[in-house]
């Protein structure tokens, strides 16, 4: 059984770094070059343990032997061999003990044969104690029952460096049921995928399952009035007028189909409108012409893969609210193209008619979800209880109360008591503490409300590590919300911390967890573990509410399918946290989403059909729109700069019209074009100007004298810096900010240190102040002279192949747009000038700036990639040099003057590999300097 499972589900090959995709890590377990051996044995099971011991002696490596209990018992003499004093490394034997042979439990015979017959003739049942067998042979034995136990046992056995038998307790019936669920899940997934493909016409004629393109994207800033402040605010934050702001995304497909999405960050999370707009402007540029595959609506990592491969950005770098709005707009566009609703689109063929019937029976309606009302407990117990009684009379079956905002938990408990006295138990009560209580206060509240039948208490404690402790001490049902919002990386591994039965629900806000794909992943984990998946919103407009209604219904279908797989009764209908619609005094459309009492159930519900109809007929109320953005048009022009007996025709590209001027300098082989997405993203905050540096792209050098003068002139860092200073003075009378990458970063650093009267600050991306000693510079000069000769002798393409094969570019080579980036490196008109610029501006030719750093007068921001070990260390040393003053106020000022940021998931070419964090950092740097 174990071997068959490994053959079926294990992966024993190394994943290609070239095709790496940023999907959830649980989908791609990685085994690095593990050598696997096996012996069939007589009758399939004899002598396996002895063979493993011989293999360990022969290969002189540590061996892990995984074996079933029956095979183990057929070779117990191997334990005697194991105990012999033979020169070899320790062996770890993992015995899967299900007390018999289980293979027949997976065959049809198990369903048609009496259990007594199976036990007697097929299962080879035994009651042998493996622990006692090991004790008899003086072999260490460990018994484990869970995955965590196994991990600990493996760690201990490896630390102790001794032979060990690890017995893993298993159960034939549980194993058979697990395999049944896997088979049914695989069948369901295949059916769903086939359904998606069949729903799209002429898909067989389309390459790579791509059937449409994004023609363009635009966005609008909206502002709508609220009746009351969002419950995330404190009572004393209330102003005269309350508004909610956000963006409407509009995606146009190549067949004129349109999809709408909403991006509405909330103030209590790590996003703001300015940061969000930077990302929207970047994506607006990057998404134009992007292909969309037909499998995106499956959500199972497809969006993440598309963002990485098509847009070239790690999905984790996109703000959650932006990703949510982007997915919403694309799904709505695809649904419109297909002529279906969003819920039908993402459901595909996942749900059987039986699942839908079970759900209809549970909701007493054809397709709808129940709504949980939200109550901000600002008032006396009597006042709050009266509000709840009115909600119950209106048809709400569930209310959520905000607690932990009063002096004492007993005051909140008094409100719950009064509600039960006034309304009774005909309504479900949820309470939400928003992590505001200490463990002691949460326990105090819990002990006061034990008899009031709370459906759950949401985020009762301020420290995550106290959640399980609270569950066990209070015996109250708990729900997670902010804890889910803060999960990073491998979400499923993080969720495993919360399998405790006391955690009964996960509250999922798609705009906070990062869209529908992540929300589905979290919801499915909850449903598989028998927990409620409650969809909630963050005071968004009816556009988001309509999408969440359809998504919540999809999750209910998913839950029905899971209950069928697990042979579990379908629980009563879940009321989803979409009651924030009552806060909307205005909406972004003339008519909001219809949420009302259903005639079928007398409960407040949202109809999936109404939600679909709202999106289908969505019309923007222009009175709510503050401004519209389509796309920034770049200006392209040439400026001639003279210097002595030569001049340079600088090609410039420009975006934005603000008073702040930011000059962008590329690295060797780059051009001004590579800064286009960054400049467009920052065009609301700065006038961005990118430059083709001398010898690069379309910036030729012109000589006013003979060839001998040309040979004598060096395009050194100092010379280029002088040229750029003259260029900047021609462009603007004001000070500027420099942003430079690699070679451009060295030039920017030189100018920031030397021309502080004109340079207000500089962002140094993967830059260096040069080499400290002459010996190192001499070696580097020789290396770069050889490389320049290679460029002149064998041409640019050969040089590119050699240049980008180095270790410095390993991370860039893994980027899905690497080939596109390399093609952009061929756009240079004068190879001779390019080779001259390369050698003359070599770090071996440059004067060291290490000694000048401590005299720096302007703010500097150093940005490096997480995988760029060399430049991470250089940036750290530069910060130390700048701040190496003797205490006092000078030290404090130097610390503020120098910042360092390490960008995750990238190497040397930070701005190309992971651009969004770079854009955000540069934007904040611009804002910071504007305040000085």
Which residues does each PLM region occupy?
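Active-site loop/oxyanion-hole signature of alpha/beta-hydrolase fold enzymes
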Residues: 642-653, 673, 677-680, 684-739, ...
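Thiamine diphosphate
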Residues: 9-12, 16, 23-194
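Metal- or metallocofactor-binding catalytic centers and their adjacent structured scaffolds
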Residues: 209, 252-338
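Flexible C-terminal active-site loop/helix
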Residues: 190-205, 209, 241, 538-630
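Conserved loop-alpha-helix segment in the C-terminal half of the alpha/beta-hydrolase fold
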Residues: 855-906
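Conserved alpha/beta-hydrolase catalytic His-Asp/Glu region
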Residues: 774-778, 790-852
């Amino acid at each position: 059984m174990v071997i068959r499972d490994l053959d079926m589900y294990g992966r024993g090959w190394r994943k290609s770094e070239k095709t790496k995709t940023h999907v959830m890590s649980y989908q791609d377990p990685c085994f690095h070059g593990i050598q696997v051996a096996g012996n069939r044995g007589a009758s399939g099971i004899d002598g396996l343990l002895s063979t493993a011991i011989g293999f360990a002696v022969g290969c002189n490596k540590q061996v892990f032997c995984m074996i079933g209990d029956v095979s183990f018992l057929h070779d117990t003499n191997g334990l005697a061999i194991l105990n012999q004093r033979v020169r070899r490394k320790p062996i770890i034997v993992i015995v899967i003990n299900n007390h018999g042979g289980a293979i027949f439990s997976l065959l049809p015979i198990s369903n048609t044969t009496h259990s007594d017959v199976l036990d007697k003739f097929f299962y080879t049942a035994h009651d042998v104690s493996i622990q006692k067998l090991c004790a008899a042979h003086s072999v260490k034995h460990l018994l484990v029952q869970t995955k965590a136990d196994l991990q600990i046992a493996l760690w201990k056995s490896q630390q102790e460096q001794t032979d060990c038998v690890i017995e893993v307790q298993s159960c034939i019936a549980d194993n058979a049921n697990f395999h049944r669920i896997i088979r049914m899940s695989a069948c369901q997934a295949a059916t769903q995928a086939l359904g998606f493909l069949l729903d799209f016409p002429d898909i067989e004629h389309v390459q790579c399952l791509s059937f449409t393109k994004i023609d363009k994207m635009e966005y609008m800033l909206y502002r709508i009035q609220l009746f009351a402040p969002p419950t995330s605010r404190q009572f004393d934050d209330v102003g005269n007028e309350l508004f909610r702001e956000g963006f409407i995304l509009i995606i146009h497909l190549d067949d004129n189909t349109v999809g709408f999405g909403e991006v509405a960050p909330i103030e209590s999370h790590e996003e703001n409108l300015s940061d969000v707009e930077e990302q929207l402007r970047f994506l607006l540029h990057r998404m134009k012409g992007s292909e969309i595959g037909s499998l995106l609506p499956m959500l199972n990592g497809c969006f993440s893969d598309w963002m990485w491969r098509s847009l070239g950005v790690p999905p984790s770098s996109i703000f959650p609210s932006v990703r949510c709005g982007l997915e919403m707009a694309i799904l709505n566009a695809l649904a419109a193209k297909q002529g279906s609703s969003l819920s039908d689109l993402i459901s595909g063929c996942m749900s059987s008619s039986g699942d839908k019937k079970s759900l209809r029976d549970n909701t007493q309606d054809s397709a709808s979800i129940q709504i949980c009302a939200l109550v901000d407990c600002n008032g006396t117990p009597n006042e709050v209880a009266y509000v709840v009684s009115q909600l119950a009379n209106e048809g709400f079956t569930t209310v959520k109360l905000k607690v932990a905002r009063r002096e004492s938990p007993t005051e909140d408990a008094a409100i719950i008591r009064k509600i039960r006295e006034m309304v009774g138990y005909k309504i479900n009560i949820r309470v939400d503490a928003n992590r505001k209580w200490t463990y002691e206060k949460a326990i105090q509240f819990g002990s006061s409300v034990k008899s009031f039948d709370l459906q759950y208490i949401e985020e009762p404690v301020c420290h995550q590590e106290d959640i399980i402790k609270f569950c066990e001490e209070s015996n109250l049902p708990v729900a997670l919300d902010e804890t889910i919002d803060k999960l990073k990386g491998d979400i499923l591994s993080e969720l495993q911390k919360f399998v405790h039965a006391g955690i009964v629900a996960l509250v999922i806000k798609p705009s906070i967890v990062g869209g529908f794909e992540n929300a589905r992943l979290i919801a499915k984990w909850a449903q598989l573990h028998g927990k409620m998946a409650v969809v909630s919103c963050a005071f968004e407009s009816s556009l988001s509410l309509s999408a969440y209604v359809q998504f919540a219904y999809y999750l209910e279908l998913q839950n029905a399918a899971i209950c069928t797989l697990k042979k579990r009764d379908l629980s009563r209908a879940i009321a989803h946290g979409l009651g924030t619609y009552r806060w909307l005094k205005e909406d972004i459309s003339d008519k909001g989403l219809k949420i009302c009492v259903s005639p079928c159930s007398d409960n407040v519900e949202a109809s999936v059909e109404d939600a679909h109809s709202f999106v289908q007929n969505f019309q923007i109320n222009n009175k709510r729109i503050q401004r519209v953005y389509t796309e920034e048009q770049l200006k392209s022009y040439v400026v001639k700069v003279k210097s002595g007996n030569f001049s340079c025709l600088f090609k410039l590209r420009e975006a934005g019209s603000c008073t702040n001027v930011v000059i962008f300098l590329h690295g060797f082989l780059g051009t001004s074009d590579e800064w286009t997405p960054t400049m467009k993203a920052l065009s609301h905050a700065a006038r961005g100007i990118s430059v083709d540096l001398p010898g690069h792209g379309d910036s030729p050098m012109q000589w006013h004298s003979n060839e001998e003068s040309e040979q004598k002139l060096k395009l050194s860092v100092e010379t280029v810096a002088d040229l750029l200073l003259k260029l900047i003075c021609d462009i603007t009378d004001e000070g500027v900010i420099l942003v430079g990458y690699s070679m451009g970063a060295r030039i920017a650093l030189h100018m920031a240190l030397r021309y502080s009267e004109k340079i207000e600050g500089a962002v140094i991306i993967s830059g260096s102040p040069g080499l400290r000693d002459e010996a190192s510079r001499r070696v580097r000069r020789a290396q770069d002279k050889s490389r320049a000769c290679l460029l002149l002798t064998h041409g640019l393409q050969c040089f590119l192949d050699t240049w980008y094969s180095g270790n410095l570019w390993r991370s860039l080579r893994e980027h899905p747009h690497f080939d596109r980036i390399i093609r952009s490196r061929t756009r240079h008109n004068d190879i001779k000038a390019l080779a001259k610029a390369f050698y003359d501006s070599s770090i071996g030719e440059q004067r060291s700036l290490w000694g000048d750093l401590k005299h720096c007068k302007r703010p500097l921001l150093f940005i490096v990639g997480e995988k760029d070990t060399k430049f991470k260390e250089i940036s750290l040393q530069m910060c130390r040099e700048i701040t190496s003053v003797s205490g006092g106020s000078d030290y404090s000022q130097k610390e503020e003057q120098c910042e360092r940021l390490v960008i995750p998931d990238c190497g040397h070419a930070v701005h190309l590999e992971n651009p969004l964090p770079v854009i955000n950092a540069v934007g904040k740097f611009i804002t910071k300097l504007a305040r000085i």
